[in-house]
Structure formats: structure tokens, C-alpha cells
Amino acid sequence: MSVQEVVGDPRFFARSGPYDVAAVAEAVGASIPADCTLSLTGVAPLQIAGPSEVSFLDNRRYADALEQTRAGAVIIKADMVDRVPAGVIALVVPEPYLAWARVAALFYPLPPVQPGIHPSAVVDETACIDPSAQIGPLAVIEAGVEIGPDCRIAAHAVIGAGVKMGRSCRIGSHASLSHAILGDRVYVYPGVRIGQDGFGFAPSSEGFVTVPQLGRVVLENDVEVGANSTIDRGSMHDTVIGAGSRLDNLVMIAHNVRMGRACVIVSQVGISGSTTLGDHVVLAGQAGLIGHLKIGSGARIGAQAGVMADVPAGAEIVGSPAQPAKDFFRQIATLRRLARR
């Protein structure tokens, strides 16, 4: 089977535009000569972009592709201007990838919400749904739910009793939310589970006794939760995901975890109960954290790290058990030297 590569396949993505290059430059804060009047119709990678498309370079390893591109305009840093082919307009910015995100969103904005409640949706009469919200097929909205303006609830999603969400939230298909408070612009992708019981039980002579989980989940503004991730509600304190944080697919957050602002949690990370993260913490794929830890702001934890102790702010740690990155790589280098003897 042969499928031609297409950026923004119109079967799936609605394109806006065209836009004059001056409008694109203004959107990213770039300056261009006053006589530039090129009309741009879309975005594409350097290798396949055509004369009416915008591309970008943020990684120098692709500099050769920049020199050969046929794009109409490219978003680059100042130190790459001399490698832009003749006839290609350079949009010079300090952060090309950030500018690229804004330009791509300009050409491919999010689909507008289609206000209304699908006839097959099950909506409790006590739910409060803003008239501008969209409730999809077979969605379930339970008693006392509050859904703000411009929200979209996709097919088969279940919004449990009392859940409250702000404006412009997106809840993916087959997601379930209970015992949760959502801010504005929260994106919950398909299959996510939010607000279920935390993993709490007390041992007894006859087995285990389940501990009631009496907290909530709070997702602050601009949080995104990737597909099939799970966030347990708190036992007595809330589980909190700080504003602007991004959780990848298949992430597990246990009860009472408190995450600061703008954290990045990559796929298959597991954070045990009552662990606290500061702001701008990064956890790479499959990292595991035991409970009741404190991870300082700006800490970076490597892939598959096993974190069993507090991590100071700004630290970089890797390995299992986790240790400072410099120590880890020094040990690896020593082992390699010993192995050659």
C-alpha cells in the first residue's frame, strides 16, 4: 500500500487562509521587507514545502534541507539566514518552534464548537450546560454537572455528578470524569479516567479494608491530559495538576499528588501518592516516583528513572535508583573502561 504524504489532509483538517506573508510575519513578530507580497496557503516540512507554503528550521541537523527547500517562506534563527535559498523569504525569530506552532494554528485552527445536545445524549435535568456548549452522541451528563461556555463533550464521554468545568474545555470520546473541578481550556483526550478512587486500603487480620477517598481532582487552566491516562482523586487532600501542565498518553497520577505549573509528564510515567512537584518539572518516559516525595521546581528526571528520594530544584537525575546525571554517566564511563581491560 502506497500513501502519498500530505500535510493537513483536508479529510481531517480544515484549513484557513490564504494569508499574506506580512500577516504571517506579524503573527510571529518577524520583520520582512515592505515589498514582500507573497500569498501563503499552508505549512509543510522543509523537504516537501512548495512556493506558497511556510516551513521552519529549529534543529541545525536539518540545515541541508533548508538549503534545498522550495518553501515560499521559512521560520529560522538569525544565525541561519545565510543558508536560506534565493527567493525564499526568511522569517527571523528567536524561537522558531514556538513561532511554527503559532503559524500552524493560524492555518489550522481548532474546529469550532457546534452548540447543542445530541438527541442520544443522557443529560440529568439538574445539570447546568451553557447554551454554547456541545454534547456529543451517547454522552452522559449526571446530576449537578456544570459545563461552561464553548465546551465540547465528545461521544460516549461520562461526566459524573457534580463535576464542574470552565470555558473552552474539550473532553474526548470515552473519557470519564468524576469528583473533578476543571479550569478553562482543559483538554482531556480519549479514554482518560479522572477522579476514580485512589489506591488506598488498610490491612487487617482479615484482609484489606478500603479507605474512603474523600478528595477531588483539580485540573487548573490550560492543562492537557493525554489519551488513556489516569488521575486518581485525593484521599483527603485534592489531587492537583498545575496550570499549563502537559501529560502525555498512558500517564498514571496517584491520589494526593500536587503538580506545579507547566510540568511535562511523558508517556508511561507513574507518580505515587502524595508526591509533590514544583513548577516546570520534566519527567521523561517510564520514570517512576515513590510516594511522599518532593520534586523541586525545574528538576529534570530521565527516562526509566526510579526515584526514591527527594529531588532538589534544578537537578538532573537519571538511572534506577535515580542519581545525579553527572554521577550516573561517570559510573558508566568507568565501567566501560574496566570492561576493556
Curated annotation (Swiss-Prot):
This protein's pathway: Bacterial outer membrane biogenesis; LPS lipid A biosynthesis
GO-annotated cellular components: membrane
Catalytic activity, reaction form: a UDP-3-O-[(3R)-3-hydroxyacyl]-alpha-D-glucosamine + a (3R)-hydroxyacyl-[ACP] = a UDP-2-N,3-O-bis[(3R)-3-hydroxyacyl]-alpha-D-glucosamine + holo-[ACP] + H(+)
Its EC number(s): 2.3.1.191
Superkingdom per UniProt: Bacteria
Active site (record annotation): H255
Keywords: Acyltransferase, Lipid A biosynthesis, Lipid biosynthesis, Lipid metabolism, Repeat, Transferase
GO function term, MF aspect, one: N-acyltransferase activity
Key word Acyltransferase present: yes
GO biological process per UniProt: lipid A biosynthetic process
Pfam short name (any one): Hexapep
PROSITE patterns: HEXAPEP_TRANSFERASES (PS00101)
Function: Catalyzes the N-acylation of UDP-3-O-acylglucosamine using 3-hydroxyacyl-ACP as the acyl donor. Is involved in the biosynthesis of lipid A, a phosphorylated glycolipid that anchors the lipopolysaccharide to the outer membrane of the cell.
Subunit organization: Homotrimer.
Family membership noted in the UniProt record: Belongs to the transferase hexapeptide repeat family. LpxD subfamily.
Protein name: UDP-3-O-acylglucosamine N-acyltransferase
Originating organism: Granulibacter bethesdensis (strain ATCC BAA-1260 / CGDNIH1)
Gene encoding the protein: lpxD
